[in-house]
Amino acid sequence: MAKFLDAVAGFGVTFASMFKKHVTEEYPEKPGPVAPRYHGRHQLNRYPDGLEKCIGCELCAWACPADAIYVEGADNTEELRYSPGERYGRVYQINYLRCIGCGLCVEACPTRALTMTNDYEMADDNRADLIYEKDRLLAPLLPEMTAPPHPRAPGATDKDYYLGNVTAHGLREAQRAGEPR
């Protein structure tokens, strides 16, 4: 008799859930909410004037435990400027076949160029399409942004960009008036 009661107790969860109302997830038509800090697809961010935040330092690639990131830096010139600093990430690739979504690359980035979005739909039937190049990772240009390459905002320094003093229309008014930086 004790063995029978043990078997009934073992199936207690099963029996309890058999008589509950079923919940249907309508996933493809109505995606559910994700947590605000969900680690989804990566995004390379831009400054308000359109220049890229990535300086090609390769710290994200060094921090990646899965070796999923490849960065090749190049030097900026005054004629062809992609970021406000001396360098920019000429080649940037993330291999989502290897990425484990840990976010260590985001923590390692000194300019906050790399963030993770809430986009989780990255499935594909072609392995080559899961290696995201820079053009798929860059944040879209907003209407007031200018596509790089273009010169820095007039009178702006690297420090102005990193402190957030540059807007889509140039330096903030307080900075032009001569307030200390």
From Swiss-Prot:
It is found in: Cell membrane. Its cofactor is [4Fe-4S] cluster. Coiled coil: none annotated. The keyword Phosphoprotein does not apply. InterPro entries: 4Fe4S_Fe-S-bd, 4Fe4S_Fe_S_CS, NADH_quinone_OxRdtase_chainI. It holds the Pfam family Fer4_7. GO terms for cellular component: plasma membrane. Its EC number is 7.1.1.-. Binds 2 [4Fe-4S] clusters per subunit. [4Fe-4S] cluster 2 binds at residues 64, 99, 102, 105. [4Fe-4S] cluster 1 binds at residues 54, 57, 60, 109. Belongs to the complex I 23 kDa subunit family. NDH-1 is composed of 14 different subunits. Subunits NuoA, H, J, K, L, M, N constitute the membrane sector of the complex. This is NADH-quinone oxidoreductase subunit I 2. It comes from Mycolicibacterium paratuberculosis (strain ATCC BAA-968 / K-10) (Mycobacterium paratuberculosis).
